[in-house]
Every structure is written in structure tokens, then in C-alpha cells.
Amino acid sequence: MEDTAIIRSPQPSINAPGFHLPPTDSQQSSAIELPFQFQATTFGATETAAQISLASANAITKLASLYRHVRLTQCAATITPTAAAIANPLTVNIVWVSDNSTAKPTEILNVFGGSSYTFGGALNATKPLTIPLPMNSVNCMLKDSVLYTDCPKLLAYSAAPSSPSKTPTATIQIHGKLRLSSPLLQAN
């Protein structure tokens, strides 16, 4: 029986949490915690250089649209190889950075914590790989009364394959939980 466990690969990080506005002394608004997941990009057909900012990701802004405050409580990126990866192996470079980082996807291996993973082929992994967001090195407040420039951003890169696949050989999903509070007053 094949082991189908997801492999976790924590990214080394520098302890530099983001700052945010302190809560007021008044009673806090009620809050809910919602899960989210979205496909960030695919690999294998062409060169892929992706920069995914969580504060402006469509799936998150839809959930956040009815609230004034949104905090990220959990987050990870999962690279999932497809069956096409066996015949068309690929290497993916990935790193979590803050939104205001000037690093480009092609420079991932020059960023502290940047890693390279190979999927497919005869001997390499075809299991999903999860890279948790190092919450201690970014500002997890995605929406507030002010804009923050140090929210999480995922950089991912895969070079153009020597024999491009017609279908993706891997995808990246970003998933986690959001704490939404202070509902916005809306017209019915």
C-alpha cells in the first residue's frame, strides 16, 4: 500500500513579525474564522514565475469584502504534482516573503528560506508538499483601518520544461484560515 501522507517542509525564517494597530479598549466586535483555499498557479506547460500577494488575492478579498478587519490565523502553500509529472519531471522554487520584498521569482534561491523541490520522473516524489507560512516573519493583518505593505506574498518559479506538457504537471494551492471581524454596514 502506497503512503499518501503529505510531506511538510517548514521554511526557515527570521523572527520579524509585522506591526499592526493595537485594538481599542472598547468591546471588540464579534468575529468568525473561515477557511479558504485557492489555486495560485500551475506548472509544466511553460516557464512559470508567480508572485501571489495574500492581501490582494481574489479568493481572500471576496471573503473579506464584508468585514473591516481580516487577520490570517493559519496559512500554507501546497504543491500538488499531477500524474503528468511522472513522464515530465519539474523543479519548483518557492519562498514566502513580505509584500514589500523586492525579490523576484527568478531570485528565490538567493532569498533566505528559499527552497527548490523536484517532482516526477522515475525516482522523485509525486506526493503533495506543504510549505507553511512562517507567521513570525510577516504581518498577518490582511485588512485593517490602514494598509500594510508587509503582508505575506508567495514567490514560485519553474523554468520552461524541455518537453512541455499539454496539461499542468503540478499546481500550487494556498490554504488557511482567516479571522474576520467588525462587519461593514451594507444596504440590503
UniProtKB/Swiss-Prot annotation:
Q: Which cysteines are joined by disulfide bonds?
A: none
Gene3D superfamilies reported for this sequence: 2.60.120.20
Gene Ontology CC, one term: T=3 icosahedral viral capsid
Localization terms from the record: Virion
Q: Which domain of life is it from?
A: Viruses
Supply the SUPFAM superfamilies for this chain.
Answer: Positive stranded ssRNA viruses (SSF88633)
Recite the UniProt keywords alphabetically. Capsid protein, T=3 icosahedral capsid protein, Virion
Q: Which residues form a coiled coil?
A: none
Name where it mostly resides. Answer: virion
InterPro entries referenced in this protein's UniProt entry, alphabetically: Tymo_coat, Viral_coat
Annotated GO MF terms:
structural molecule activity
**One Pfam match:** Tymo_coat
Q: Which family does it belong to?
A: Belongs to the tymoviruses capsid protein family.
The record describes the protein's role as: Self-assembles to form a T=3 icosahedral capsid composed of 180 copies of the capsid protein. The capsid encapsulates the single-stranded RNA genome.
Q: What is this protein called?
A: Capsid protein
Q: Which organism is it from?
A: Eggplant mosaic virus
